[in-house]
Design a protein with these regions (language model features):
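Short, Lys/Arg-rich cytosolic juxtamembrane segment immediately N-terminal
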Residues: 8-12
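Short, non-transmembrane alpha-helical segments in secretory-pathway proteins
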Residues: 94-112, 119, 233-255, 304-346, ...
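Preferential activation on post-signal-peptide N-terminal prodomains/segments
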Residues: 2-6, 16-312
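Exposed beta-strand-loop-beta-strand "reactive/processing" segments of non-cytosolic proteins
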Residues: 247-292, 331-386, 415-438
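Zymogen propeptides/activation segments of proteases
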Residues: 18, 149-153, 157-206, 317, ...
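Short low-polarity hydrophobic stretches
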Residues: 25-29, 320, 371, 438
Length: 438
């Protein structure tokens, strides 16, 4: 009896030891795999799939394509019950208002195919009672915008600047950056508008209408008083551990780590991080330049053959947006980025982003950020980080109604933006010509 008990205890101990050994082996393997660069592993192997599954790599298109919008609207408007209200250049108001009208856009962007139309047809639709308007800075692919809004209508051949929908005539109008108009038939129920009214809080406005030089769908706010602060730049040191910058997070955004080999240039004003797949040049003042070496990369939007067409662009945009959000948080810039243009050149796609402060674009002579993909692989990226602070002074912009009246025949749209002026960044109203965006 005692021998049987001792045998049972020994068996239990042996099983426990075996389990512990197996667990230790698994932990050691996981620890080793965590230190391996994803780019150094062949894509179609069990090891690469395990790395992706455990450490957030390519875990499937459904995970990478989040559906989160990468572009912030410049203006939104909702017309119902005999009045038109709108919001502009305010991140919080934009987020709340866009959520309120999203269901309308889902229906408006799920209609028939787009066909080219004329200005008068749009002008006639602008007087409808139930309307919505959505305007972006730049040139955003139509299919991408439709996907963000939950729509099913696709067209991979055009980019959009402004979308307008009239529920009264069941017409969707799309304005391209070149000024071309497209129209689609789409139905949206009245109940969707009624629900949107409960959460959409804007200021009274009107459409410019026909007869002027600006586009007829241009929003003119009643008694507009757009007052914005003047900005100054603050010193940025990406290498200062005490300055609040997360260098490890900056490196991690590009698939590198604090253990990645680097060398210094210009008396340590620039550090160049190098591994087998890529090079990241990091200037302490905020300029980041990423390039790949050979066919590999530490950043991928999707695996070869995983997605094609519009889904590929969606994944590229989502990858760039996520990376850029991580960089901006790590550098504590208090700004955010908005997709501005998508440029195709053969097998390569370049995504260009604007920098926004408080919802207002900050314009420079060079792009704030750009990402070049070849298929799912990030080949190059440039980010010009800046940190701003209000000077304590402010400036009131010329109201859109007055600015629209002063527009020349080739100045069809307007935007508010910051530009460098006498040592500060000052807000002003700018005119845009057809084709200037993107």
């Amino acid at each position: 009896m005692r021998g049987a008990e001792r045998s049972a205890r020994n068996t239990a101990k042996n099983i426990s030891l075996i389990v512990l050994v197996v667990l230790m082996a698994v932990l050691c393997a996981a620890n080793w795999l965590a230190g391996v660069s994803a780019a150094s592993l062949d894509s179609d192997t069990l090891l690469r799939r395990a790395h992706d599954r455990l450490f957030g790599g390519a875990a499937g298109y459904e995970i990478r394509s989040s559906g989160v919008s990468a572009a912030s609207p410049a203006q939104l408007a909702l017309g119902a019950e005999g009045k038109l209200v709108g919001v502009q250049y305010n991140v919080t108001d934009m987020d709340t208002s866009l959520a309120a009208v999203r269901a309308i856009w889902t229906q408006a962007l799920s209609g028939g195919a787009l066909e080219e139309t004329d200005e008068q047809t749009l002008a006639d639709a602008l007087i409808a009672e139930r309307t919505v308007l959505l305007r972006y800075h730049g040139a955003i692919p139509f299919s991408v915008v439709s996907g963000w809004m939950g729509g099913t209508l696709k067209n991979d051949n055009i980019s959009v600047e402004t979308l307008f929908y009239s529920a009264d005539s069941s017409e969707l109008f799309v304005r391209t950056p070149e000024g071309t108009l497209y129209r689609s038939h789409a139905e949206a129920d009245r109940g969707t508008f009624d629900r949107a009214l409960e959460d959409f809080h804007g200021l009274d406005c009107t459409f410019a209408g026909a007869g002027g030089n600006v586009y007829p769908e241009t929003l003119l706010f009643a008694n507009e008083n757009l007052t914005l602060p003047l900005l100054r730049t603050e010193a940025l040191d990406l290498f200062d551990a005490q300055g609040g910058t997360g260098l490890a997070s900056l490196l991690g955004a590009f698939g590198l780590s604090a253990y990645t080999d680097f060398y210094s240039e210009q008396s340590d004003a620039v550090r160049v991080f190098v591994d087998d797949a890529s090079t990241l040049r990091l200037a302490k003042t905020g300029r980041m330049q990423y390039t790949t070496t050979g066919d590999q990369s530490t950043v991928t939007a999707y695996e070869s053959g995983e997605v094609t067409g519009a889904a590929a662009i969606d994944a590229q945009i989502d990858c760039a947006r996520t990376l850029l959000d991580t960089v901006l948080r790590a550098a504590q810039t208090d700004t955010h980025a908005s997709l501005y243009a998508v440029r195709k050149d053969g097998s390569r796609t370049t995504l260009v982003f604007l920098q926004l402060y408080g919802g207002v674009p900050v314009l420079e002579s060079t792009d704030f950020a750009s990402f070049t993909f070849e298929g799912g692989v990030l080949r190059a990226a440039t980010v010009n980080l800046q940190r701003f602070a209000a000077t304590g002074e402010s400036r009131t912009l010329l109201p859109a109604e007055q600015a629209s009246a002063a527009a020349s025949p080739d100045e069809r749209s307007m935007m508010a933006a910051y530009r460098a002026e006498n040592g500060v960044y000052a807000p002003a109203r700018f005119y845009m010509k057809p084709g200037q965006a993107g």
